[in-house]
UniProtKB/Swiss-Prot annotation:
The keyword GTP-binding belongs to this UniProt entry's keyword annotation: no
Protein name in UniProt: Chaperone protein DnaK
Positions of modified residues (Phosphothreonine): T200
Gene3D superfamilies hit by this protein: 1.20.1270.10, 3.30.420.40, Actin, Chain A, domain 4 (3.90.640.10), Substrate Binding Domain Of DNAk, Chain A, domain 1 (2.60.34.10)
Keyword line: ATP-binding, Chaperone, Nucleotide-binding, Phosphoprotein, Stress response
Keyword Transcription annotated: no
Originating gene: dnaK
Induction comment from the UniProt entry of this chain: By stress conditions e.g. heat shock.
Organism field: Xylella fastidiosa (strain M12)
Chain residue ranges for the region called Disordered: 599-623
Low complexity bias locations: 609-620
NCBIfam families tied to this protein: PRK00290.1, PRK05183.1, prok_dnaK
Length: 638
């Protein structure tokens, strides 16, 4: 069995870890960084850039550079959270045929968020393969604890498109607890994991216990907000900068994608700087221009101002903490330790708010950027048998049930139920002689079905006609360890049964996934060909440069006919380099190498000939000296 890698697929950054010698290890990417920006860009020449390379060119290619797509994964275009983002990102968010939120490139090509995420996962997969020296096909991928079924399914689909068999979907706070608690001694304890990442927020209350020599991690309760994170903090800074500039110059920068991308980068930098300093300056020369000429943005931002801008966001993260504690039946004094996860928790105001709520300082010995990936790797190690004596008991974050008469949401599995789990309930018909029922599966906490997330609808036909209320329809829910739901409905009299693995009404169909897998494979081949083309061009450029230098140095010493041949070969190679035919470039390179070799040989021969001619007058003297030395040696022997 090969390695099962652990991947933290983050909104802003992603991280990869493996188990090595029984311990988790974060693997650096090809740029030498321990985290990779979750950014994918499509260039004009068709190249796909991922990570730091995509981030570097974002300012000059804003409409084709996609970031924070995790906020869109598994969501409908009409969702309020998606609508809120429409004018705040420089790229286009569009509606797919099934109502899902997709993105589109500047030339109109539509892409599913799963496809974008798959590009990031592919980079993680390649990083692992380069490090391990073997093929990697299996992974544990983390998701926010508060992700619903659609979002979990979509994340698995992204893994599949990237060529990964996702062995387990694991909640981010639970993964962080695994990374933190695996080697810790000190008996049973309850911890709170406060996870404020780039795009999502979760809090989980977890009990770590020793049971018969086995370390057990049991999630007691979880809560959160899948649309609250560092991106929202950045947006507050962007809005402030835009409003200040508008007041000063009368120009709204929101309408300029290029300016918006520059503002995003500057806002993120300013926010990070203010975690360690009291004041920073946002300086963006030539941010825009009007009839009077170019305009420059120069605004001072203090830590106090930033904290005022995001105060409600920080407070918004505390309410889920209160709910999670209440669901777990605990008080803040029952929590022994608080762990911070996610880059946004580096902000002093966030740390203070958490300390004030829980009544204790959060721990600082957990790396907020790496803990989740390490936990995913540990879970992979458990599944592969590399890590022993660890039991993870996670929960479902939201209640699951069906719509019943009058539009009521009837819960079958309550939120915070330990998974995997099964539950069933018996229902009946609403009308006399009814021969079929529609089972509408929902997820959420509202009493009215229409306010909850619709996961699936299916029909159970073949019910024996009878007066209303008499038929007995048993509806069973089965949640697997990934938090993914299977539902069945059975007529207890006829034993007619209908089973479904819940595939959200949104999400990708099998044929779409297969097409994307094929596209990804083709793209991998394209990438390989592109790399080969670049190598051929680079070799040709080096050859052109060295040959031009040789002509400059030796051109006057060799025949005009040879120089003519070299110049002709040079021109042919320079023309080939401008094209995309690797074979042509290599063939012309070979021709130039051969004539350049002739040039080198001719120049060397000419040099030797000149050297021989210059030394002819002194050759006799040299011979005499040699003979004299030879004679003297002979004379000595006599």
């Amino acid at each position: 069995m090969g390695k099962i890698i652990g991947i933290d697929l983050g909104t802003t950054n992603s991280c990869l870890a493996i188990i090595e010698g029984g311990k988790g290890r974060v693997i650096e990417n090809s740029e030498g960084d321990r985290t990779t920006p979750s950014i994918v860009a499509y260039t004009k020449d068709g190249e796909v850039l991922v990570g730091a390379a995509a981030k570097r060119q974002a300012v000059t290619n804003p409409k084709n550079t996609f970031y924070a797509v995790k906020r869109l994964i598994g969501r409908k275009f009409g969702d309020a959270e998606v609508q809120k983002d429409l004018d705040l990102v420089p790229y286009k968010i569009t509606q797919h045929d099934n109502g899902d939120a997709w993105v589109a490139t500047a030339d109109g090509k539509k892409l599913a968020p799963q496809e974008i995420s798959a590009k990031v996962l592919e980079k993680m997969k390649k990083t692992a393969e380069d490090f391990l020296g073997e093929k990697v096909t299996e992974a544990v991928i983390t998701v926010p604890a508060y992700f619903n079924d659609s979002q979990r399914q979509a994340t698995k689909d992204a893994g599949r498109i990237a060529g990964l068999d996702v062995k387990r979907i694991i909640n981010e706070p639970t993964a962080a607890a695994l990374a933190y608690g695996l080697d810790k001694k000190g008996g049973d304890r309850k911890i709170a994991v406060y996870d404020l990442g780039g795009g999502t927020f979760d809090v989980s209350i977890i009990e770590i216990a020793e049971v018969d020599g086995e370390k057990q991690f049991e999630v007691l309760a979880t809560n959160g907000d899948t649309f609250l994170g560092g991106e929202d903090f950045d947006k507050r800074v962007i809005d402030y900068l835009v409003d200040e500039f508008n007041k000063d110059q009368g120009i709204d920068l929101r309408k300029d994608p290029l300016a918006l991308q520059r503002l995003k980068d500057a806002a993120e930098r300013a926010k990070i700087e203010l975690s360690s300093s009291q004041q920073t300056e946002v300086n963006l020369p030539y941010i825009t221009a009007d009839a009077s000429g170019p305009k420059h943005l120069n605004i001072k931002l203090t830590r106090a101002k930033l904290e005022a801008l995001v105060d409600d966001l920080v407070r918004k993260s505390i309410e889920p903490c209160r709910i999670a504690l209440n669901d777990a039946g605990l008080r803040t004094s029952d929590v022994q330790e608080v762990i911070l996860v996610g880059g946004q928790t580096r902000m002093p105001k966030v740390q203070q708010a958490v300390a004030d709520f829980f009544g204790k300082e959060p721990r600082k010995d957990v790396n907020p950027d790496e803990a989740v990936a390490l936990g995913a790797a540990i879970q992979g190690g458990v599944l592969a048998g590399d890590v022993k004596d660890v039991l993870l008991l996670d929960v479902t974050p939201l209640s699951l049930g069906i719509e019943t008469m009058g539009g009521v949401f009837t819960k079958i599995i309550e939120k915070n139920t330990t998974i995997p789990t099964k539950a069933s309930q018996v229902f009946s018909t609403a009308e006399d002689g009814q021969s079929a029922v529609t089972v509408h599966v929902l997820q959420g906490e509202r009493e009215q079905a229409r306010f909850n997330k619709s996961l699936a609808k299916f029909d159970l036909a073949g019910i024996e006609p009878a007066p209303r209320g008499q038929p007995q329809i048993e509806v069973s829910f089965d949640i697997d360890a990934n938090g993914i739901l299977h539902v069945s409905a059975k007529d207890k009299k006829t034993n007619k049964e209908q089973k479904v693995e819940v595939k959200a009404g949104s999400g990708l169909s099998d044929s779409e996934i297969q097409q994307m897998v094929a596209d990804a494979e083709a793209h991998r081949e394209e990438d390989k060909k592109f790399q080969e083309l670049v190598q051929a061009r680079n070799h040709a450029d080096g050859l052109i440069h060295s040959t031009r230098s040789a002509i400059k140095e030796h051109g006057s010493k060799v025949g005009g006919e040879l120089i003519g041949r070299v110049e002709a070969s040079l021109a042919e190679l320079e023309a080939a380099v401008k094209g995309d035919d690797k074979n042509q470039i290599e063939a012309k390179s070979k021709t130039l190498e051969e004539v350049a070799q002739s040039l080198h040989m001719a120049a060397t021969a000419e040099q030797q000939s000149a050297s021989t001619g210059a030394g002819a007058g002194s050759s006799a003297k040299v011979d005499d000296v040699v003979d004299a030395e030879f004679t003297e040696v002979k004379g000595d022997k006599k």
